[in-house]
């Protein structure tokens, strides 16, 4: 087994038993693949069914009303973005690119005859069709400078669905749902009548739709019912027994007798195959029935007197005595009737026809028109056009390929081609037939929560739909323009207005429910947000109406949606996370991977199955035991089939799970010993990992699951090597790799990776990248070169490993509180950097422009000490609450001045009184260091000194970067040819004769550009030098071009909002240490608040004097059933012990052979998966041992982790008791505790619920306008609510004066509080109470009811 660069430095011991079959697919592919499909830029790869192409093809050609112009679509191109991703974030711009569409305008001769079209002219050009947002490499969008994610939506798939309502009668209904267009419903009522609805409007008979499709009453009956022939004569009535086999299973309503009057089959019996044979053998072809039975029947076809052409009876008329007499009169002794005798099937449609008052297609169309457009007078043309537009015109109605596939599959017919996306007559007939079958018990209703009936709509599809909406508006505009614009040579640009497209797309990205501000607490929260699947949003469910069934875990979720990770609040079950191996297929259905089983042998062939396919197979679990030939060991094994867990013979198994973790999401797969935790707690654990705050220094978890490196790799926060090569240069800002062109598929000699430094995330945490490679290191493609935030050697590291003791300590861990050691604070383990952004905007007001300046009236010099001459704070300044960050003045209205004031103003030239200080100040409760300042201003007034200074710094930095990049390229080019050219014969060189030998000394005097001008006699060498020369010159041109482009983007003027003159952004880094009140958690849902930070000397300690870091309450475990944390603590202790063992060996010797023995015992004495230490050289072994001193990292994959025996064996090797308990001593007294305590290493996280963000106090502040009471909440600088129950408490104590103060001056007594403030200033301690404002509000409300109520103050005066 080979190890990557980062893995060699720290190998994780893995405990999994199951073989590794399939790598976890790229975690962000659901985002990137979907948008790539929408935005197929490369026309050569075929854009036939890509998003943009198909929308444009469907929308064009557009024809003018008079038919003279036709606009055709030819092709499209997506241009280059104006700014790159980083610049867009800095400038608050959108990362997008212009869409240019090639349109062809065909002009026809207007004098031609009506039916002929003569082309007069064809004009083609590219037309700008708005800007399309581009996706970043990490699957996000930058909209107005902020990073956003478009969450995928799980919605009901297009197709037909049959359901049964929850009422007592249990009425059945069918619904045809298109991808876009009107919904069509059919439903039974309690009487068995079939009704139809279009778009949930008023219901009408289902047969009206059939008549509107052109079916006659006779054809409808023929389609939906059987007919039987009755013969009649003077003896009575007889029913012909045709199609006896169709009658099997039906209840007989009469005796069947043979010619001798022997009863063959009795009445009220269900007919069997044996009965049918008996009847045939007896030669019975008809049976006598009485008139009572005949009178319940109806005519199947119109009865016409052939002699006169007169209609005696219409189809569906009742059979009556008068009808029979009329038939006898014209000599008809046979009657074709609807078969109600042997089956009830035909009665539903027959009864519906009785209710249906329409007689033909025209009347049916009018009836539908009246339902959809009540009040509109129906005109013949509009009636037909409306009905056809509902279901039969593709621009208005589309089932899409998914809907057509589902409809054909559900109706079990392929009569309709899969390329037809509108409804056909046979579809509607088929749906009604299937509905009748379900009512008759011959079919099943659909399970709407089955993942075969719900599909994922990803970002590409949503943007495609928005684009279609915008293009539809553009299309209407084009038609109008064609008829309005009168120009000699009309061009496509003249008639296309692209604003509706831009508006539709902008609306979706800025205010759409599924376009969300990216959750960026840490890399895991980013990945999880991008893999989120929501059932909410437009066209989805609403959380108020969603019932329990929709939210519940369904059998088809297995391997597709995680059954664990979902929010805890009102959205529970509506927002899900994609399972780790799941993918979305071309139809939008979720698929899970399985290993194929052939003839009882499990192969390594992987097949992805959707929920629909999976129902038909028997699937074994990943943990099923196999022998060395991959055959099942046991004869009877546990499997899944059709959503049920079953035990079955191994010969019946068709597929097997790929991995034990395939049913859970990425976040849940990070929880070790997940299988030992209660599901509710795991849910909390998975959700809380997303809230972990990245700390100053990341530390890998000692006990992990092996999923850490996958999440870190796919999050995009680490820098990954693109090619094989050697590290040429490393500093904190960049890594330069000299590429090995022989092993890499690239012609680049150099790869340069720029690192992100101290960038603010969406959640105000600090994004910073640190290199982990050294100069001279050899790297492979895919190796981690630099760690991002919350990663350690390419592994996700959200918290720290702490030594935990499960014991009470003086009540400080009551109710999940956490007792922390002061060592944790001292070592800055949970210290985090938060970057806050403060913005100051100078606007043009009615009274004049606001100004950012250091010249501010009535402000002391000390307050301006941290500002530069432009009035903006210096970078590096330490700022406290109330400090000025940006000094700004705003003009205020001129006041009438007295002559004296005017004189003083003139003498002192004082203009201070007509401006007001509106500076940006540091908010209360915060302090930090200014790390960056950005200034954006319009060019109209010229740039300020600070803006020019920032601009110059950026240009100098860019120049330096590009110069360094070029220097590296030069050195790489030099080293690639130097050895070969020294000692070679010269063909031509300045200063040397032909045939001379080139020396190293001569080369040292020349710059590289002169080297490359030398030509050599050796042709092969000459060719190599020629290639190097070309590469060097191309690189020089490319770097100069890149610098010019960068310089242009830096100096380019900023587009500010209207009325804004200047915007200044100040970034302040705030350091937050852990303190009492902060929330912490483990990975098993074990959360708590820090109650006290205890000095190290007072903490309980072990026999060797090592103090523990944390005391947790043991009572928090039994009731919560998250035992995984105990197992994690035991395994963590073992890991720590193994680290100590390696450290002791290192202290004794640094010989690789001895260290290998220790590592062999540590890694390979326990567990099935061995570590190949032979793959590491001696130097790498030493580095590995140095990195393992703090503990040997262990991976225990979910559902396939370490067993109890493994943990005990490791504890023994690590030198601890196998029960994981030990004697602890009280730090205060030195005495041992009565009982042994469970001690171990647990991975603890600091969550983004910091006490600093919640602490808040107010003395005076803003008040509510109506009630005049103080506002609530920290954001409004509000006060503490003194509620009803608090009032009762004061009443109970009889604290009358305190109560009066609370309800008046401290709340809404306006006059009283002003007086009180004045009294405090004057040093008086009296309190005058007035009428509280809420009484005035009450009085006004009573007056609104017409009652004049007022307060009577007279008694007080008397």
Swiss-Prot record:
EC number: 2.7.7.6
Reactions this protein catalyses: RNA(n) + a ribonucleoside 5'-triphosphate = RNA(n+1) + diphosphate
Cellular component GO terms held in the UniProt record: DNA-directed RNA polymerase complex
Ranges that cross the membrane: none
Keyword Cytoplasm in annotation: no
One Gene Ontology molecular-function label: ribonucleoside binding
Keyword terms, alphabetized: DNA-directed RNA polymerase, Nucleotidyltransferase, Transcription, Transferase
Enzyme class: transferase
Similarity field: Belongs to the RNA polymerase beta chain family.
PANTHER family hit by this protein: DNA-DIRECTED RNA POLYMERASE I SUBUNIT 2
Complex formation: The RNAP catalytic core consists of 2 alpha, 1 beta, 1 beta' and 1 omega subunit. When a sigma factor is associated with the core the holoenzyme is formed, which can initiate transcription.
Job description of the protein: DNA-dependent RNA polymerase catalyzes the transcription of DNA into RNA using the four ribonucleoside triphosphates as substrates.
Protein name: DNA-directed RNA polymerase subunit beta
Top-level taxonomy: Bacteria, Pseudomonadati, Pseudomonadota, Gammaproteobacteria, Thiotrichales
Gene name of the record: rpoB
């Amino acid at each position: 087994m080979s190890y990557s660069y980062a893995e060699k430095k720290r190998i994780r011991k893995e405990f999994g038993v199951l073989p590794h079959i399939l790598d976890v697919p790229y975690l962000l592919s659901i985002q990137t693949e979907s948008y790539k499909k929408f935005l197929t830029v490369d026309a050569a790869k075929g854009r036939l069914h890509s998003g943009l192409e198909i929308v444009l093809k469907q929308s064009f050609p557009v024809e003018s009303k008079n038919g003279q112009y036709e606009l055709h679509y030819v092709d499209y191109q997506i241009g280059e973005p104006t700014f790159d991703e980083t610049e867009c974030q800095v400038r608050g711009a959108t990362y997008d690119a212009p869409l240019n569409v090639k349109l062809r305008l065909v002009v026809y001769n207007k004098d031609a005859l009506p039916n002929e079209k003569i082309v007069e002219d064809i004009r083609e050009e590219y037309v700008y069709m708005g800007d399309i947002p581009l996706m970043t490499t990490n699957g996000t969008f930058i909209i107005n400078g902020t990073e956003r994610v478009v969450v995928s939506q799980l919605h009901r798939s297009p197709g037909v669905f049959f359901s049964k309502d929850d009422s007592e009668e249990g009425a059945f209904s069918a619904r045809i749902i298109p991808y876009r267009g009107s919904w069509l419903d059919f439903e039974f009522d309690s009487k068995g009548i079939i009704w139809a609805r279009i778009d949930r409007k008023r219901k009408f008979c289902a047969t009206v739709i059939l008549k509107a499709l052109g079916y006659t009453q006779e054809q409808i009956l023929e389609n939906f019912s059987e007919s039987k022939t009755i013969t009649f004569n003077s003896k009575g009535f007889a029913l012909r027994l045709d199609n006896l086999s169709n009658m099997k299973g039906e209840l007989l309503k009469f005796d069947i007798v043979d010619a001798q009057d022997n009863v063959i089959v009795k009445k009220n019996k269900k007919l069997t195959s044996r009965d049918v044979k008996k009847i045939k053998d007896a030669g019975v072809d008809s049976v006598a029935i009485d008139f009572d039975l005949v009178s319940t029947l109806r005519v199947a076809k119109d009865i016409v007197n052939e002699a006169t052409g007169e209609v005696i009876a219409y189809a569906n008329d009742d059979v009556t005595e008068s009808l029979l007499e009329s038939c006898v009169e014209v000599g008809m002794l046979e009657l074709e009737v609807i078969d109600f005798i042997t089956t009830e099937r035909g009665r539903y449609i027959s009864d519906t026809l009785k209710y249906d008052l329409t007689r033909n297609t025209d009347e049916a169309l009018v009836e539908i028109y009246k339902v959809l457009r009540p009040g509109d007078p129906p005109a013949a043309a509009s009636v037909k056009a409306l009905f056809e537009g509902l279901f039969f015109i593709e621009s208005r109605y589309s089932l899409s390929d998914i809907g057509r596939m589902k409809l054909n599959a559900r109706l079990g017919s392929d009569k309709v081609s899969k390329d037809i996306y509108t409804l056909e007559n046979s579809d509607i007939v088929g749906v009604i037939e299937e509905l009748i079958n379900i009512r008759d018990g011959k079919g099943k209703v659909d399970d709407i929560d089955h993942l075969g009936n719900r599909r994922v709509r990803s970002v590409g599809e949503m943007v495609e739909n928005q684009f279609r909406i915008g293009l539809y508006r553009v299309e209407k505009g084009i038609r109008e323009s064609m008829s309005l614009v009168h120009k000699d040579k009309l061009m496509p640009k003249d008639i296309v207005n692209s604003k509706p497209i831009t508006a539709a797309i902008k609306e979706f990205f800025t205010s759409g429910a599924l376009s969300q501000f990216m959750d960026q607490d840490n890399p895991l929260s980013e990945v999880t947000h991008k893999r989120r699947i929501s059932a909410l949003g437009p066209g989805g469910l609403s959380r108020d109406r969603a019932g329990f069934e929709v939210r519940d875990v369904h059998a088809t979720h297995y391997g597709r949606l995680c059954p664990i990770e979902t929010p805890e609040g009102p959205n529970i079950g509506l927002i899900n996370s994609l399972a780790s191996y799941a993918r979305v297929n071309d139809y939008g259905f979720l698929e899970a991977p399985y290993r194929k089983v052939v003839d009882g042998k499990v192969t390594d062939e992987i097949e992805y199955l959707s929920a629909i396919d999976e129902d038909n197979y028997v699937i074994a679990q990943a943990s099923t035991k196999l022998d060395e030939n991959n055959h099942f060991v046991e004869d009877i094994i546990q499997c899944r089939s059709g959503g049920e867990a079953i035990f079955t013979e191994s010969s019946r198994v068709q597929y097997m799970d790929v991995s034990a973790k395939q049913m859970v999401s990425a976040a849940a797969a990070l929880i070790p010993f997940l299988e030992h935790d209660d599901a509710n707690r795991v849910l909390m654990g998975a959700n809380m990992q997303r809230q972990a705050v990245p700390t100053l220094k990341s530390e890998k978890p000692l006990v992990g699951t092996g999923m850490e490196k996958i999440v870190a790799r796919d999050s995009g926060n680490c820098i990954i090597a693109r090619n094989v090569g050697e590290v040429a240069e490393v500093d904190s800002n960049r890594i330069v790799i000299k590429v090995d062109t022989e092993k890499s598929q690239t012609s680049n000699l150099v790869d340069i990776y720029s690192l992100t430094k101290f960038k603010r995330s969406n959640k105000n945490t600090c994004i910073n990248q640190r290199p982990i490679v050294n100069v001279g290191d050899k790297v492979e493609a895919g190796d981690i070169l630099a760690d991002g935030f919350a990663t350690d050697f390419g592994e996700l590291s959200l918290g720290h490993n702490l030594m935990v003791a499960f014991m009470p300590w003086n009540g400080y861990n009551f109710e999940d509180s956490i007792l922390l050691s002061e060592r944790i604070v001292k070592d800055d383990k949970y210290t985090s950097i938060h970057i806050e952004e403060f913005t100051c905007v100078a606007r043009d007001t009615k009274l004049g422009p606001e100004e950012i300046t250091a010249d501010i009236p009535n402000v002391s010099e000390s307050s301006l000490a941290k500002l530069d001459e432009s009035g903006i704070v210096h970078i590096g300044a330490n700022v406290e609450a109330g400090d000025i960050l940006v000094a700004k003045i705003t003009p205020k209205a001129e006041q009438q001045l007295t002559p004296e004031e005017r004189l003083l103003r003139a003498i002192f030239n004082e203009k201070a009184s007509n401006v007001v200080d509106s500076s940006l100040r540091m908010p209360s409760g915060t302090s930090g260091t200014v790390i960056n300042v950005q200034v954006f201003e319009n060019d109209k007034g010229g740039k300020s000194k600070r803006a020019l200074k920032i601009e110059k710094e950026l240009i100098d930095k860019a120049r330096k970067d590009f110069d360094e990049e070029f220097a590296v390229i030069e050195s790489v080019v030099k080293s690639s040819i130097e050895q070969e050219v020294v000692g070679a014969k010269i063909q031509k060189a300045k200063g040397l004769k032909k045939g001379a030998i080139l020396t190293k000394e001569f080369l040292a005097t020349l710059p590289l550009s002169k080297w490359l001008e030398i030509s050599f006699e050796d042709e092969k060498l000459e060719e190599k030098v020629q290639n190097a020369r070309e590469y060097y010159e191309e690189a020089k041109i490319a770097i100069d071009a890149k610098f010019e482009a960068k310089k242009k983007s830096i100096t380019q003027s900023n587009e500010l909002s209207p009325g804004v003159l200047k915007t200044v952004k100040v970034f302040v880094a705030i350091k937050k240490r852990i303190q009492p009140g902060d929330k912490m958690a483990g990975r098993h849902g074990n959360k708590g608040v820090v109650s006290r930070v205890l000095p190290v000397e007072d903490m309980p300690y072990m026999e060797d004097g090592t103090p523990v870091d944390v005391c947790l309450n043991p009572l928090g475990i039994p009731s919560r059933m998250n035992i995984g944390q105990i197992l994690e603590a035991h395994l963590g202790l073992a890991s720590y012990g193994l680290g100590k063992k390696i450290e002791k060996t290192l202290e004794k010797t640094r010989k690789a052979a001895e260290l290998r023995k220790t590592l062999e015992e540590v890694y390979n004495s326990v567990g099935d998966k061995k570590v190949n230490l032979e793959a590491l050289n001696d130097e790498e072994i030493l580095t590995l041992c140095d990195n393992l001193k703090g503990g040997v990292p262990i991976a225990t994959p979910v559902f396939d982790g370490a067993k109890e025996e493994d943990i005990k064996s490791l504890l023994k090797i690590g030198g601890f008791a196998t029960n994981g308990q030990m004697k602890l001593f009280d730090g205060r007294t030195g005495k041992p505790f009565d009982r042994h305590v469970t001690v171990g290493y647990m991975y603890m996280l600091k969550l983004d619920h910091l006490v600093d963000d919640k602490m808040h106090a107010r003395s005076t502040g803003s008040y509510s306008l109506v009630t005049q009471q103080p506002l609530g909440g920290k954001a409004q600088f509000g006060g503490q609510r003194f509620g009803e129950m608090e009032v009762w408490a004061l009443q109970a104590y009889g604290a009358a004066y305190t109560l009066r103060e609370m309800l008046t001056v401290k709340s809404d007594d306006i006059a009283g509080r002003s007086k009180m403030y004045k009294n405090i200033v004057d040093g008086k301690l009296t309190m005058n109470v007035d009428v509280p404002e809420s009484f005035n509000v009450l009085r006004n409300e009573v007056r609104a009811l017409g009652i004049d109520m007022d307060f009577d103050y007279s008694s007080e005066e008397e």
